[in-house]
């Protein structure tokens, strides 16, 4: 308790800091303390004692009364001030306390570090657990390794070894050079005279020497010999060494080696013979270290030559030297690896025979040769174990020095340093630096260097990142500054704070000189400077400077201190910088609308003039994403390495060009003076690689700069459409539809070819034209007939005389579908190998340019596979080729083969009386509309507008009988029998329209304006992350292309994908342009009933759900307007109410439930509507659509407003076609097949909750902040601080009387705990884990399916899914027991399928809870 008159402190940090007025703290009362706002725990607050009139408007004496004002950090991460008005705390304009703000910032940083520490500890524990798992797995796998059987020793090898050993122990049983003879020379005859003379002289000299030797001389000689041989003084050791000579040592060693060979060798015969020949030849120990160099063949060659050496050493030496030469010639038929091994063995044999003979002749022993060979092998082995170099790293892990370890590396560095340390030939210049022009840029992601230039602070764009404001540190002071502009380069311009304007400035260099550049930067708050010579590569520089942390954004200056570039990065070998120009300081001014229209008119005129001569196809430029815009994650590591290697190759190429330029560009008449000096051409460079090698290198890392020379060659020859990028696709003045204007007329009735068939190349010009903007150009038709030239203002694109259906082409676009490995993983045969690649003349120019080298490589693999009849390498090779094609915007070759095999669909032709419009336009159905006929499926309270010819059934009484279910045991739990697959007749269609009716809503916007305003405020506040969303291009939209294309396209195409393959994107763009120009076609929706598992009672009552789908062109127009918002909603499921895109796996369910529990409210509500999307009031649905539209970017919001109004009008007033051919009009509810059905239902659900909250509690915004909810369509689970009395009855009445919506009694469950409530088909248990709410429905879908499973593996996989869903159910639950029983049955039939028999408990918990790394409970 707080004593009266004592200052109040909320926590120990608050007492330690003691910010503000102590008098204000003394005024705190217990009532004021209990009503305090929710500040951050254990954080300081500042107390102020302020005059009341300065805060609350008042007059009289109360003006000068003082009130307590508290300022601090709130739990939602904001900074606010609150004043006590006598009864409660009221939020006021924040009062700035610099010390408090700094403290809160440090506390926030400390909390973040603690959180990082906690995560690191969790990761450490996870890694430790993984290590234990791996250790257990290692032990288990070791047990599975088969133990080798003991080798049986055969008696014959024991006998052979004994005989060879006996022969080896015979004295003189080896080659003696004195007794060798030769077949070429009679050595005895030649040396007879010399030998007799030498013998006589030798005997005479020995006799004279022995006559003069005394006893003392003999003792001294023995003593010196013993000392020289290091023989110990011990008498018994001298005796042993005396009797054991070299001869006896080798024989003992050979004897032991022979025994070991018999016992352990895998080829004892060959090894024993080698041992014997080594003794016989006299080479002995020198043979052993050469054996690993031999193959079986060369080993027998060596044995043969050693036997030959015993009889004739000169002949053996000659044959040994000739053996490698003959082997090189006669063994060339072998493959490379075997060929090299054989030649290596022959060379080793030659070295042994020749070297052994030299050693025996000079020293009488081969010990020296043995030592040399053994030393070479040891050095080779040591270099392998030690490594090539040592790396010395600093505390941050960055390499600061490398030390070579191999001898060749050390020698290379020595000669390099020796060459560099020659006589000084020049004088280094001084450079100008301005340390006062540098500062430090601090962001939450890290620090970098900036410099002052003009009125801006310049740094690297990747230092700023996505931050709008950054901290500028200069001379110990910190300033907040706003990021002004970031061009396409990796440069950012920051507005200089007013207090920093008098500082020094760096000017740009007008005459760049790259002979000596200076890099200045701050590293750990220390100024570092380095100079180097730079090389220019397009818009970038490279120089040999090692980058350290914090150098990004530093200025790169010339020797006069003028800025040349902005330092970017370091790939480990060279530093890099982007060149900065004066034009980079200011955004490029976008052309006005009039200028754009003029350019468009001129471009169209040029197209029309050249259409007859140069037919072209559609060109679509892929959006270019720079390296700065890419996020560095685990999945991007390979791309980043490729980009770095591409840059290093380009740097190396330019440097070599600069060095070789003086030698390669010698002109006639020039002298050789100065030819040896290095002259660098900094602006130009000659490619040293061939075009094929260059393209192969670019395929590993394409970017705009290095690929510009290829873009000009493929303009007009490459088709496709731009990928959607929600961050980089848009710009303020160009959103993809800028080419459409009010005064520009497009004729889209002409057929547009989106295929990749080889077009006629455009004529070459002397000056290459710049890459045009993505556009669609009409392909001219047959112009062979003479036509009168029309005036320029009347010229139009030629129209077809007769509408024709365009069949799918074999080279059609795949529309952005990435290749999937499963499509390639099948048994390939010779036909597949022959037809996977088209003939060379069928390849497009884009294929040749982008995929040329890969296609050549695949053709080689195909030829080899057909010859060897081994097709195992084809799937991976074709997959890699298709993957590269997909990344380049081309169609995969497997898809082309499929298109050929499938061929065009044989469907009825389009009606001839529709003219150029036929079935492409959105209102084409109107021309087919016939007068109404008999009313069969449309209820009487809906209008019957007419009849359309369609062939679709209105009866469905099919109940599939799956024979695979006969394998499953008979169930003992029959609760599932109340469910079944839907069947219907005409009455079900009539009944399905009841979803739109329950009660009539009132004009709630007029009756309850304050509550509606509160609901709007809450909706804008909840979905504020949708602010500034964009309209995307129609060709960048994503949608399920396997869906029906609606009427009348469904008469000619089964799916939208077939329609796209036949006609491409031209009809889509034409219809969007038509709507944009003011036309308002009426769209036709197609209605069908949903096949699903529902209660048998509903089936008997024909209560089946209806689904409506619109024309795919209309759906994609809606995707243009709302796809960006939908994508953002799916990304914010953790913090927002909408759960579309949410996954309950990996702890997702528990995390969401914990989020509601953490609010601390006492009440939890489960809410379920009936006929939810059908009874949504049209006024409310239109209002939600308007709220969504208000989040769109301001410029685009006004530009496309009329398109959005037309789109919403067709949602609210739907012309619907039934399978019976009847056409009616629906004006109620949210259609279940529109593009944003679940997202719109979420927003309507949330808006209704906010209205309901204000209806019972009043529009209390502070109380609303304690409210939280999660919604998925009509599912709702919420937590609220208060619930009124008789809540269920009152809320049901409110929705019926005000909105006309139906909430059945019993569908509103209010509890003081979240346990037992359900959301998205799961009930929350005590551990906040999911339990299926209706397991009997799941069992019905297993035993009474509406679709037959294809095979037994699918049935087993379905059972595994049910086991996963039942993970947290009671062990004795009938559904869980039955699933386990079924798994045991199906697992016996699938022993070799690769599927697990069942999921273990550990696997189930890993899937639901996320495992150690993603564990949420």
From Swiss-Prot:
One cellular component term from this protein's GO annotations in UniProt: host cell membrane
EC id: 3.4.21.-, 2.7.7.48
Biased composition (Basic and acidic residues): 784-796
Coiled coil spans: 105-143, 588-615
PROSITE patterns named in the record: RDRP_SSRNA_POS
GO biological process, one term: viral RNA genome replication
Reactions accelerated catalytically: RNA(n) + a ribonucleoside 5'-triphosphate = RNA(n+1) + diphosphate
Region (Disordered) residue spans: 753-813
Keyword Membrane: yes
Record site feature (Cleavage), residues: 176-177, 420-421, 665-666, 756-757, 914-915
Domain RdRp catalytic residue range list: 1162-1288
Active-site residues (renumbered): 462, 490, 552
A molecular-function term among this protein's GO annotations: RNA-directed RNA polymerase activity
Keywords carried by this UniProt record: ATP-binding, Coiled coil, Covalent protein-RNA linkage, Host membrane, Hydrolase, Membrane, Nucleotide-binding, Nucleotidyltransferase, Phosphoprotein, Protease, RNA-directed RNA polymerase, Serine protease, Transferase, Transmembrane, Transmembrane helix, Viral RNA replication
Positions of post-translational O-(5'-phospho-RNA)-tyrosine modification: 694
Family in the record: Belongs to the astroviridae polyprotein 1AB family.
Protein name (record): Non-structural polyprotein 1AB
Species of the source: Human astrovirus-8 (HAstV-8)
Lineage: Viruses, Riboviria, Orthornavirae, Pisuviricota, Stelpaviricetes
